């Protein structure tokens, strides 16, 4: 058994009589309540409160979803309607602007001066290199620069002068070949002469029967050191082949002592 004490306050009523002036401030009323009766209302109240909480949560979730959808729609519409954002301009005071322009002008002037100095130094170095390279060949360089290689002014005269130069070249080449041939013939003649002298010496030693007498070889011609390069031999089985057109042209183009004649 559970006992609850309930206190109640009674206010004075204007309708009460004067005889009932005594006021009861508080009265204690004892109520007997069974344990089962006390538990039931608590359970019912808790169930009601749980249902109310569920309903409020569902309402909040629905409201939140609707708010999110509306926010997303608003944000998409705002993004589509948004214009490109420009940076806010920065205004500089006149004094600061004048200082900045002065510093920029000074920096540009210094850069120009440095660039001009570098260009002057490079030109001087190039002149020095040219002077050192052509100090010994200045005359040749001047002659080469003064040559007139334009053939359009007098083509016939240029052709005649070219033919003259070609003729001089051929004569020089022919003279060179003749000198070489004469040198070879002289070598062969000296070799034959030395061979004859050796044979005469052998004959004199056999006929006398006496002791070998040394014979002066004053008549022998001293050969040069480069004579060993020439070793002529006798011709054996000489055959001449028929020359075709191609072979004749190749032989004609070949440089020899008779090619210029």
From Swiss-Prot:
Residues 70-84 have a biased composition (Acidic residues). Keywords: mRNA processing, mRNA splicing, Nucleus, Ribonucleoprotein, RNA-binding, Spliceosome. One of its GO terms (cellular component) is spliceosomal complex. It is found in: Nucleus. One of its GO terms (molecular function) is RNA binding. Residues 37-55 have a biased composition (Basic and acidic residues). Residues 1-88, 205-229 are annotated as: Disordered. The keyword Manganese does not apply. The keyword RNA-binding applies. Residues 13-32 have a biased composition (Low complexity). One of its GO terms (biological process) is mRNA processing. Component of the 25S U4/U6.U5 tri-snRNP particle, a subcomplex of the spliceosome. Component of the spliceosome and rRNA processing machinery. In association with the spliceosomal U4/U6.U5 tri-snRNP particle, required for splicing of pre-mRNA. Belongs to the SPP381 family. This is Pre-mRNA-splicing factor SPP381. The lineage of its organism: Eukaryota, Fungi, Dikarya, Ascomycota, Saccharomycotina.
